[in-house]
Amino acid sequence: MVQENKNFATAKAKSIRVSPRKLNLVAAFIRNMKVSEALVQLTFSPKRIAKVVKTCLQSAIANAENNLGLDIDRLVVTKATVGKALVMKRVMPRAKGRATRINKFFSNLYITVTEKEDN
């Protein structure tokens, strides 16, 4: 069996109470960014969901450092993908005895950090 050098670490956050469209705005913002820069940007971001994305990114960094022994200073966010999770359906009463459905969306977030070679 051939041993492959694994130079990436992943972290995931599931069932986050935000729509995938809103979460993808923040995820797309940190893609291909150095992790130190991404943490600074997420800390000062006005988006509510940036706090959850920052927690997931810190988990990926910790996985890279503790499980694989990668250098934190050379880590880059290579993937930040967003997926749809469950949809909570609620009913809102309206006029004349009618009712409308309200969909409350949930999302999944997957972050991959990779150690880049110095050129």
UniProtKB/Swiss-Prot annotation:
GO MF annotations, alphabetized: rRNA binding; structural constituent of ribosome
PANTHER family assigned to the protein according to its UniProt record, in alphabetical order: CHLOROPLAST 50S RIBOSOMAL PROTEIN L22-RELATED (PTHR13501), LARGE RIBOSOMAL SUBUNIT PROTEIN UL22M (PTHR13501:SF8)
Keyword rRNA-binding carried by entry: yes
PROSITE patterns attached to this UniProt entry: RIBOSOMAL_L22
The keyword Cell wall biogenesis/degradation is annotated on this UniProt entry: no
InterPro entries recorded: Ribosomal_uL22, Ribosomal_uL22_bac/chlpt-type, Ribosomal_uL22_bac/org-type, Ribosomal_uL22_CS, Ribosomal_uL22_sf
Summary of the function given for this chain in its UniProt record: This protein binds specifically to 23S rRNA; its binding is stimulated by other ribosomal proteins, e.g. L4, L17, and L20. It is important during the early stages of 50S assembly. It makes multiple contacts with different domains of the 23S rRNA in the assembled 50S subunit and ribosome. The globular domain of the protein is located near the polypeptide exit tunnel on the outside of the subunit, while an extended beta-hairpin is found that lines the wall of the exit tunnel in the center of the 70S ribosome.
Classification of source organism: Bacteria, Pseudomonadati, Pseudomonadota, Alphaproteobacteria, Rickettsiales
Record NCBIfam families: rplV_bact (TIGR01044)
Family: Belongs to the universal ribosomal protein uL22 family.
Pfam families with a match to the protein in the record: Ribosomal_L22
One GO CC term, this protein: cytosolic large ribosomal subunit
Highest taxon of the lineage: Bacteria
Species of provenance: Rickettsia canadensis (strain McKiel)
Protein name, per record: Large ribosomal subunit protein uL22
Gene Ontology BP, a term: translation
Assembly and oligomerization: Part of the 50S ribosomal subunit.
Key words, A-Z: Ribonucleoprotein, Ribosomal protein, RNA-binding, rRNA-binding
